């Protein structure tokens, strides 16, 4: 079956060839399609021809399986014990490939990918919309060799005029609604895909408040125009980044010629930061003397992680420290009228709040 055999044939051909001189470029069309041009690779594996030759060698009139069947029935000689070896058929490299052709023929591959999940519960529709919208804006980003990619430059300002809605975000250390709330989740997803690829990240900011759903010290916050996420392509070939949004997740994948970087991480110890404060908010609709915690307070803390990037030979290319300092979360206590200042909360857990993840 060609569909089943093709991945194995392409993988074998890739192992046999020398990709040291291979580089690719990407060309985007207005209709969203991507064309690929390859340099340093003159041939592509022809899976269909290879499968046909293999089929003939195994099941043809003189094939090994046919001979074995005839021998079992008392006719002919026993087939040779050596395995059947068929060279991979090759053809000339087209001047231009579609993205899918380049992927199927092993000219390019997805060499780093990262996925984060988000809530689809009641009240999150605006946030989901913003995540999907900014993902579309970032999708099919191309970074040339030696080039830089910027989240803010690529997406532009996140405003209502450009289709963004008001949703939960972290603003000045507190959870609030802001146009474009939620896009930081996409920034975090991109950052981790680039982090795992071993590509340089000259600019990255952590969120003001800690978000436990992300790897320790590996969140990324963006805010127009001050907070940006920037990464660089230090390879000899162009990199295409695809950002896709599913029903409850977003994925960033880097495509191109795999540089073969090996990435490891040293995670430091958490250190104590600033202590949290408590704020009382009077709600006249509550019964006198009652109180409840709206937002549970959390002390600030900080952490540093170190990424070590090595080449295929095991040589250290660079070590990168990413430090993150998270502010405390103010505890918000909602009280009814005439509640004494020293009264502790008496009812209700803190409400779930979702920030700019």
Residue ranges and their predicted role:
Residues 1-3:
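Short, surface-exposed ligand-recognition loops at beta-strand->loop->(often short) alpha-helix junctions
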Residues 6-7, 11-20, 24-31, 35, ...:
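Well-ordered beta-sheet/strand-loop patches within structured domains
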């Amino acid at each position: 079956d060609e569909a089943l055999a093709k991945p194995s044939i392409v993988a074998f051909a890739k192992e046999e060839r020398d990709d040291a001189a291979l580089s690719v470029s990407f060309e985007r069309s207005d209709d969203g399609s991507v064309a690929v041009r390859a340099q340093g690779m003159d041939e592509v594996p022809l899976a269909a021809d290879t499968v046909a030759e293999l089929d003939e060698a195994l099941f043809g009139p003189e094939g090994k399986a046919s001979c074995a069947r005839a021998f079992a029935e008392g006719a002919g000689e026993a087939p040779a014990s050596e395995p059947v070896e068929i060279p991979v058929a090759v053809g000339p490299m087209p001047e231009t490939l579609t993205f899918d052709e380049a992927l199927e023929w092993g000219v390019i591959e997805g060499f780093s990918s990262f996925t984060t999940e988000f809530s689809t519960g009641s009240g999150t529709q605006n946030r989901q919309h913003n995540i999907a919208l900014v993902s579309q804006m970032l999708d099919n980003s191309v970074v040339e060799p030696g080039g830089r990619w910027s989240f803010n430059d690529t997406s532009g300002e996140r405003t209502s005029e450009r289709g963004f809605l008001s949703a939960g975000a972290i603003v000045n250390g507190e959870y609030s609604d802001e146009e474009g709330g939620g896009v930081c989740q996409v920034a975090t997803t991109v950052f981790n895909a680039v982090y795992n690829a071993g590509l340089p990240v000259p600019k990255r900011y952590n969120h003001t408040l800690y978000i436990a759903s992300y790897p320790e010290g590996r969140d990324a916050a963006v805010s127009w125009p001050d907070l940006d996420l920037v990464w660089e392509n230090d390879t000899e070939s162009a990199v295409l980044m695809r950002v896709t949004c599913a029903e409850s997740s977003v994925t960033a994948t880097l495509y191109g010629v795999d540089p073969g970087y090996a990435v490891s991480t040293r995670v430091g110890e958490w250190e104590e930061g600033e202590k949290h404060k408590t704020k009382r908010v009077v709600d006249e609709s509550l019964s006198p003397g009652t109180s409840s915690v709206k937002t549970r307070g959390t002390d600030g803390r900080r952490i540093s992680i170190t990424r070590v990037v090595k080449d295929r030979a095991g040589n250290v290319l660079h070590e990168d420290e990413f430090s993150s300092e998270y502010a405390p979360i103010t505890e918000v206590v909602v009280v009814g009228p005439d509640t004494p200042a020293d009264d502790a909360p008496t009812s209700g857990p803190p409400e779930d709040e979702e920030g700019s993840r």
